From Swiss-Prot:
Belongs to the G-protein coupled receptor 1 family. Coiled coil: none annotated. This is Olfactory receptor 1L8. One of its GO terms (molecular function) is G protein-coupled receptor activity. It is found in: Cell membrane. The keyword Transmembrane helix applies. Disulfide bonds join C98-C190. Residues 1-26, 81-101, 160-197, 261-272 are extracellular.
Length: 309
């Protein structure tokens, strides 16, 4: 990707990272390397368990396999560069590299968000309209939902990337972050960021809040339906099926709202923690959360491990 913004005198950015202390760098490298390997391994096991187990060939697990794939790509867009910078004295990223990382950060993060909304809709249909579940969640419809979830977010990401590329960056090139995120990069621009801020404060929240409301509506309807079930075992099964989805949604959206539902000018170092949660920790924890109380997935993982041993 060649640098397009010829009006900038900045050809690279410096990422300050999580700590400026040299003695912390190797510790952080080992910590995030372990997290990255656990993320890749855990999500890959979920994908393989679903792929090779006939009992898991359902819409719910179809969506889960794509969520795991997206989580692998999402984490890979962030962590490898972090690991390189932990061991490097010059913690730099090229202008083109910064735009590329930001593009995939937004595209894959929004794909995650879309897939969580689709999975909530799937559970809503399964619990609230079970007689039409096979028709509504047919394989054709599932493929279309996944295709939309993985393609539409790229338009959102492309919009922010192109608007950012129009800006001029003069002398300051130090990003107070461990990755190229929109708000800290906008702070470095020596040209007007009015349009960027308007888009970020209107389009981005609308996209995020709309998906979150879809998820909230789905689970409110599920809750009201489950409470009407006379059988205690039926209630327990429905709650256990949806409980881990709510855990993932809370973890993912809670951290995202902390970062992005605020003006770019108010972005602070404290937001690093929330960014780590939704870019790194969420992707690592998802496989454990999904398999913790899911007997079918546990059985699928056991079968997969027994085949490999």
């Amino acid at each position: 990707m060649e640098r397009i913004n010829h009006t900038s005198s900045v050809s690279e950015f410096i990422l300050l990272g999580l700590s400026s202390r040299p003695e912390d760098q190797k510790t952080l490298f080992v910590l995030f390397l372990i997290v990255y390997l656990v993320t890749i391994t855990g999500n890959l096991l979920i994908i393989l368990a679903i792929r090779f187990n006939p009992h898991l060939q359902t819409p719910m697990y179809f969506f889960l396999s794509f969520l795991s794939l997206t989580d692998i790509c999402f984490t890979t867009s962030v962590v490898p560069k972090m690991l390189m910078n932990f061991l490097s004295e010059k913690k730099t990223i090229s202008y083109a590299g910064c735009l590329t990382q930001m593009y995939f950060l937004y595209a894959l993060g929004n794909s995650d968000s879309c897939l969580l909304a689709v999975m909530a809709f799937d559970r809503y249909v399964a619990v609230c309209d079970p007689f039409h579940y096979v028709t509504t969640m047919s394989h054709h419809h599932c493929v279309l939902l996944v295709a939309f979830s993985c393609s539409f977010p790229h338009l959102h990401s492309l919009l922010h990337t192109l608007l950012l590329n129009r800006l001029t960056f003069c002398d300051s090139n130090v990003i107070h972050h461990f990755l190229c995120d929109l708000s800290p990069v906008l702070k470095l621009s020596c040209s007007s960021i009015f349009v960027n801020e308007i888009v970020q404060m209107t389009e981005a929240p609308i996209v995020l809040v709309t998906r979150f409301l879809c998820i909230a509506f789905s689970y409110i309807r599920i809750l009201t339906t489950v409470l009407k079930i006379p059988s205690t075992s039926g209630k327990r099964k429905a709650f256990s099926t949806c409980g881990f989805y709510l855990t993932v949604v809370t973890l993912f959206y809670g951290s995202i709202f902390c970062v992005y539902l605020q003006p770019p000018s108010t972005y602070a170092v404290k937001d690093h923690v929330a960014t780590i949660v939704y870019t790194v920790l969420s992707s690592m924890l998802n496989p454990f959360i999904y398999s913790l109380r899911n007997k079918d997935l546990k059985q699928g993982l056991r079968k997969l491990m027994s085949k490999r041993s």
